[in-house]
């Protein structure tokens, strides 16, 4: 999409709150090699942050908690964005229209693919924990990659609504389950994407059988939160003692893959 040929081309940034911990500026500044500015726009109010984008920036990345609000502002949305119902990229076209894209799902697909080896026997069930913007992108990614996708969220209605939209929009194999089914699907899943900012009590109630899994031992556990993960090193060590085939994938891998997608 052609951008306005003026000084706005030189200025990029990130909106969200809080974002002082974000690694995005370092990643994008390295990629741009000093040619463009990349700012953290750390404003708690979405409308104020969005106005700053309109006034000063050509393209912005969007992170929590603004992905849904930013999506609502777009004049044109990509197919991926439409399916996810959230955006992590907003850009201005030369005619002034705002275009929304989403590279979060590329982050999920890339991080999972990087950690699956040919000899791994892995269940084609994916468990997505949460139903915010990151979880929606994760569910879309696993659906596109051929996984039977189960979304579990504290607000069951929200998860059910999104699962239905995935089925209707893309004919995907997606469903929602209540939190009471967490241990069952942790056991059945080959891929688990954990997007909640907190360590939920259901994690502490997993049995050894749940962690070992069926029908095969290999599991990919991808966590969205790279700054303050819900799984400590000790947690991962405990899980791996029970299931040596469990691979924990840090949120930084997700971030890196989505940043590459956003940069492109």
What kind of feature is each model-predicted range?
Residues 2-118, 228, 233-234:
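Phosphate/diphosphate ligand-binding glycine-rich loop within oxidoreductases
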Residues 16, 100-105, 112, 116, ...:
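Glycine-rich adenosine-cofactor-binding loop
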Residues 63, 195-196, 224:
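Short, well-ordered coil/turn residues at beta-beta hairpins
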Residues 69, 199-222, 231-234:
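Rossmann-fold NAD(P) dinucleotide-binding segment
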Residues 152-161, 165-166, 178-206:
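Active-site rim beta-loop-alpha module in soluble metabolic enzymes
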């Amino acid at each position: 999409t052609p951008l306005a040929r003026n000084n706005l081309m030189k200025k990029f940034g990130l909106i969200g709150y809080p974002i002082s911990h974000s690694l995005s500026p370092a990643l994008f500044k390295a990629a741009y090699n000093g040619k463009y500015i990349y700012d953290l726009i750390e404003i708690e109010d979405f409308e104020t942050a969005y106005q700053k984008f309109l006034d000063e920036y050509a393209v912005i990345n969007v992170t929590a908690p603004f992905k849904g609000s930013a999506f609502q502002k777009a004049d044109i949305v990509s197919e991926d964005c439409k399916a996810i119902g959230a955006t992590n990229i907003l850009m201005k076209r030369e005619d002034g229209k705002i275009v929304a894209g989403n590279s979060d799902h590329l982050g999920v697909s890339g991080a999972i693919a990087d950690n699956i080896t040919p000899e791994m026997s892995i269940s084609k069930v994916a468990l997505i924990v949460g139903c915010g913007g990151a979880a929606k992108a994760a569910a879309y990614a696993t659906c596109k990659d051929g996984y039977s996708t189960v979304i579990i969220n504290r607000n069951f209605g929200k998860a059910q609504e999104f699962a239905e939209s995935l089925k209707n929009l893309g004919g995907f194999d997606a469903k929602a389950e209540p939190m009471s089914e967490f241990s069952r699907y942790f056991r059945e899943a080959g891929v688990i994407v954990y997007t909640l900012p907190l360590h939920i009590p259901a994690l502490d109630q997993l049995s050894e059988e749940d962690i070992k899994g069926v029908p095969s031992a290999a599991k990919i556990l991808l966590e969205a939160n790279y700054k303050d993960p819900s799984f400590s090193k000790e947690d991962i060590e405990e899980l791996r003692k029970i299931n040596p085939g469990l691979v924990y994938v840090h949120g930084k891998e997700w971030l890196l893959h989505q940043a590459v997608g956003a940069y492109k």
